[in-house]
Amino acid sequence: MNPLIAAASVIAAGLAVGLASIGPGVGQGTAAGQAVEGIARQPEAEGKIRGTLLLSLAFMEALTIYGLVVALALLFANPFV
């Protein structure tokens, strides 16, 4: 493998995981904060808020997993070779 392609693939894999985790990380923090605030305002709706929060966190985490899949493809099944 060309060393330049290998180095670029490693850098791209790191950027893929790093950049793919920024948005979901901010979104998860905001969603959790709003859920805690909603439960504090209306404690009787805790179960409904928690269920909605967990579902939305799972969807947000999927974006990070997609970045990980791209990084693994760049590292182990490099299409540029």
UniProtKB/Swiss-Prot annotation:
The record marks E61 as: Reversibly protonated during proton transport. Belongs to the ATPase C chain family. The gene is atpH. The modification N-formylmethionine is found at M1. This is ATP synthase subunit c, chloroplastic. It is a multi-pass membrane protein. GO terms for biological process: proton motive force-driven ATP synthesis. It comes from Spinacia oleracea. InterPro entries: ATP_synth_csu_bac/chlpt, ATP_synth_F0_csu, ATP_synth_F0_csu_DDCD_BS, ATP_synth_F0_csu_sf, ATPase_proteolipid_c-like_dom, F/V-ATP_Csub_sf. F(1)F(0) ATP synthase produces ATP from ADP in the presence of a proton or sodium gradient. F-type ATPases consist of two structural domains, F(1) containing the extramembraneous catalytic core and F(0) containing the membrane proton channel, linked together by a central stalk and a peripheral stalk. During catalysis, ATP synthesis in the catalytic domain of F(1) is coupled via a rotary mechanism of the central stalk subunits to proton translocation. Key component of the F(0) channel; it plays a direct role in translocation across the membrane. A homomeric c-ring of 14 subunits forms the central stalk rotor element with the F(1) delta and epsilon subunits. Its main location: plastid. It is found in: Plastid, Chloroplast thylakoid membrane. GO terms for cellular component: chloroplast thylakoid membrane; proton-transporting ATP synthase complex; proton-transporting two-sector ATPase complex, proton-transporting domain. In plastids the F-type ATPase is also known as CF(1)CF(0). One of its GO terms (molecular function) is proton-transporting ATP synthase activity, rotational mechanism. Keywords: ATP synthesis, CF(0), Chloroplast, Formylation, Hydrogen ion transport, Ion transport, Lipid-binding, Membrane, Plastid, Thylakoid, Transmembrane, Transmembrane helix, Transport. Disulfide bonds: none annotated. It holds the Pfam family ATP-synt_C. The chain crosses the membrane at residues 3-23, 57-77. F-type ATPases have 2 components, F(1) - the catalytic core - and F(0) - the membrane proton channel. F(1) has five subunits: alpha(3), beta(3), gamma(1), delta(1), epsilon(1). F(0) has four main subunits: a(1), b(1), b'(1) and c(14). The alpha and beta chains form an alternating ring which encloses part of the gamma chain. F(1) is attached to F(0) by a central stalk formed by the gamma and epsilon chains, while a peripheral stalk is formed by the delta, b and b' chains. SUPFAM superfamilies: F1F0 ATP synthase subunit C.
